Curated annotation (Swiss-Prot):
This is Low affinity immunoglobulin gamma Fc region receptor III-A. Keywords: Cell membrane, Disulfide bond, Glycoprotein, IgG-binding protein, Immunity, Immunoglobulin domain, Membrane, Receptor, Repeat, Secreted, Signal, Transmembrane, Transmembrane helix. GO terms for biological process: antibody-dependent cellular cytotoxicity; calcium-mediated signaling; Fc-gamma receptor signaling pathway; natural killer cell activation; natural killer cell degranulation; natural killer cell mediated cytotoxicity; phosphatidylinositol 3-kinase/protein kinase B signal transduction. Glycans are attached at N56, N63, N82, N180, N187. GO terms for molecular function: IgG binding; IgG receptor activity. PROSITE patterns: IG_LIKE (PS50835). GO terms for cellular component: external side of plasma membrane; extracellular space; plasma membrane. InterPro entries: Ig-like_dom, Ig-like_dom_sf, Ig-like_fold, Ig_Fc_receptor, Ig_sub. Lymphocytes and monocytes. Residues 230-254 are cytoplasmic. The record marks D222 as: Important for receptor turnover.
Length: 254
């Protein structure tokens, strides 16, 4: 870990008695947010991390090889396939970031999304991206081979709240001029909350409402019994105190 620190920052750490593991981790952001792009696309990678007053340089790594750029943003003016891979960054007062993947594809169309795994009720943003942003019309987004959404002019497709039914294979197609073009297929996965999943496994959907009603009724009955018993206890105590017992003598006391 020490060899990854910038020389100036290393001296500062030693003098301050700090350790490398005490530093925050840098973070890489893609701008725009898509990690799958087409050739000729413009891509910007930004490094977020702390800097010392003496050293505001940034170290960039592509597939573990050091890049010459030392600014906080790394620009790719026209992406090529060999730009694909993992990118990391590090600042003078941060440790090496986690890797961010960039995929450069060749084709007319590419279906883009920030990621491919979502939780239930999360929003999904899909984009049917054309090469060099060529005009695209009569666009259809398809799920499992069936049309899901149609736009006369190219538009992004939003799913406000994802459900398990939104899992599946997706691609988009449209017309560039009179040419019919399609993107590659990608898989989107919707995961379920574990707590909800465990309840659902015990009770089928048709019985969950009935189960809740039964629980409410049981609670009401239990509460009624509690107050009824609480009210009767003092009365029973008074009856016990007022009752006179007549003891019989032993035979030898007669």
């Amino acid at each position: 870990m020490w060899q990854l620190l910038l020389p100036t920052a290393l001296l500062l750490l030693v003098s301050a008695g700090m350790r490398a593991e005490d530093l925050p981790k840098a973070v890489v952001f893609l701008e725009p947010q898509w990690y799958r792009v087409l050739e000729k696309d413009r891509v910007t990678l930004k490094c977020q991390g702390a800097y010392s007053p003496e050293d505001n340089s940034t170290r960039w790594f592509h597939n573990e090889s050091l890049i010459s750029s030392q600014t906080s943003s790394y620009f790719i003016a026209a992406a090529r396939v060999n730009n694909s891979g993992e990118y990391r960054c590090q600042t003078s007062l941060s440790t090496l970031s986690d890797p961010v993947q960039l995929e450069v594809h060749i084709g007319w169309l590419l279906l883009q999304a920030p990621r491919w795994v979502f939780k239930e009720e999360e929003s999904i943003h899909l984009r049917c991206h054309s090469w060099k942003n060529t005009l695209l019309h009569k666009v259809t987004y398809l799920q499992n081979g069936k049309g899901r959404k149609y736009f006369h002019q190219n538009s992004d497709f939003y799913i406000p709240k994802a459900t398990l039914k939104d899992s599946g294979s997706y691609f988009c197609r449209g017309l560039i001029g009179s040419k019919n073009v399609s993107s590659e297929t990608v898989n989107i996965t919707i995961t379920q909350d574990l707590a909800v999943s465990s309840i659902s496994s015990f009770f089928p959907p048709g019985y969950q409402v009935s189960f809740c009603l039964v629980m409410v009724l049981l609670f009401a009955v239990d509460t009624g019994l509690y107050f009824s018993m609480k009210k009767s206890i003092p009365s029973s105590t008074r009856d016990w105190e007022d009752h006179k017992f007549k003891w019989s003598k032993d035979p030898q006391d007669k």
